[in-house]
């Protein structure tokens, strides 16, 4: 009997700092599963990479007085060496600065836009008068309007895991200088996520491989009503938004890093002289995609990533399993690279 191919993925860690043990947990779990399926005789590919874009990197680079590229080039090399010391059996550990990744992501989103799932909208967003910049994602902090956590960021609350609108933060402040932001109007490109509500509900409900925490969180998210998600940011660090009129905008990190599971597969087979074979892992219906993540990444892997794949109309395999670990606490607090809490893997 022919055994189906298995693609094992682990969440791409931000590398503004060395990783802590909490970051390593899903990677270790993925490594165990990759080794298991290899022993069972399956063709297995295990991919991941360093997420070098996004505001976590930008904020840390500002604090250190270096460029995001300088910071991430150094940390990527360090992380690769650490994974070798931990004997993680990656087939391809790459980076979101990979030319293959950039090309794939831009072509992918052009397709999504051509299919009618992208629109523009003017929004009021926080702007720091001292730093003279808009404050996307981790450039702005405040109190979570849902759970009251004081250190919530502009895109997500670390404490309760909710995706946030930065305009809803209570007592918002610039994470660089601490100033209270002004709110200025700017145009962004949005993904029409609500159009996938029914398909996502059916997919999540019927997928018996999902652990209860991932299924329950995701179904609650859908029940509360999916909202269009902004795809672009006012930033020059990241992948340029490939939409007409979007000059000077980059893609929000969660609209490009999850696509790295596909681009890393493409990159692996390109470098091994078989450039079309990646399709066997992403389109053959006897192949399975397994994602290993931390619980704060659930909505990006069970909602946004599947919706993006559906939006291409190309028949991508959706994740067969999204395995999630709970947060690893250290001295009573959630491990966090940005807050320098945890046990470091070096």
Indicate residue ranges for each PLM-predicted region.
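Cys/His-rich short segments
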Residues: 116-190
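Short glycine-/small-residue-rich flexible loop motifs, especially phosphate/cofactor-binding loops
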Residues: 34, 58, 80, 109-110, ...
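Alpha-helical scaffold segments in soluble metabolic enzymes
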Residues: 111, 146, 159, 199, ...
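N-terminal Rossmann-like or analogous alpha/beta NTP/dinucleotide-binding catalytic cores
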Residues: 2-121, 129-133, 145, 209
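Generic secondary-structure signature for well-ordered alpha-helical cores
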Residues: 84, 114-117, 162, 179, ...
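Structured secondary-structure scaffolds
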Residues: 1-41, 45-48, 95, 100-103, ...
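Short acidic, glycine/serine/threonine-rich loops at helix termini
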Residues: 57-61, 105, 131, 139, ...
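Non-catalytic, surface-exposed connector residues within folded enzymatic/regulatory domains
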Residues: 73, 121-122, 138, 168-171, ...
């Amino acid at each position: 009997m022919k055994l189906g191919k298995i693609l094992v993925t682990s969440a791409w860690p931000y590398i503004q700092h060395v990783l802590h043990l909490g970051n390593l947990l899903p990677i270790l779990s993925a490594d165990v599963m990759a080794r298991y399926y290899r022993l069972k005789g399956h063709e297995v590919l295990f991919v991941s990479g360093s997420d070098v874009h996004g505001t976590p990197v930008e904020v840390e680079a500002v604090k250190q007085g270096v460029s995001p590229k300088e910071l991430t080039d150094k940390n990527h090399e360090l992380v690769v060496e650490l994974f070798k010391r931990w004997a993680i059996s990656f087939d391809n550990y790459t980076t979101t600065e990979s030319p293959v990744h950039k090309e794939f992501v831009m072509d992918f989103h052009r397709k999504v836009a051509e299919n009618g799932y992208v629109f523009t909208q003017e929004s009021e967003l926080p702007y720091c008068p001292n730093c003279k910049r808009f404050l996307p994602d981790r450039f702005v902090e405040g109190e979570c309007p849902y759970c009251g956590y004081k250190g919530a960021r502009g895109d997500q609350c670390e404490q309760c895991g909710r995706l946030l609108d930065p305009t809803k933060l209570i007592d918002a402040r610039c994470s660089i200088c601490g100033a209270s932001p002004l709110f200025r109007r700017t145009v962004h490109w949005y993904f029409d996520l609500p159009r996938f509500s029914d398909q996502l509900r059916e997919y999540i409900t019927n997928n018996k491989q999902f652990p209860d925490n991932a299924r329950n969180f995701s179904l609650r998210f859908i029940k509360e009503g999916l909202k269009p998600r902004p795809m672009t940011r006012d930033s020059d660090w990241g992948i340029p938004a490939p939409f007409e009129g979007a000059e000077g905008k980059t893609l929000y990190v969660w609209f490009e890093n999850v696509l790295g599971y596909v681009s890393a597969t493409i990159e692996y087979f390109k470098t091994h002289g078989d450039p079309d074979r990646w399709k066997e892992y992403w389109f053959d219906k006897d192949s399975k995609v397994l994602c290993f993540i931390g619980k704060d990444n659930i909505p990006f892997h069970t909602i946004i990533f599947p919706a993006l794949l559906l939006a291409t109309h190309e028949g991508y395999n959706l994740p067969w399993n999204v395995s999630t670990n709970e947060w690893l606490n250290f001295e009573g607090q959630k491990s966090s690279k940005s807050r320098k809490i945890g046990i470091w893997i070096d």
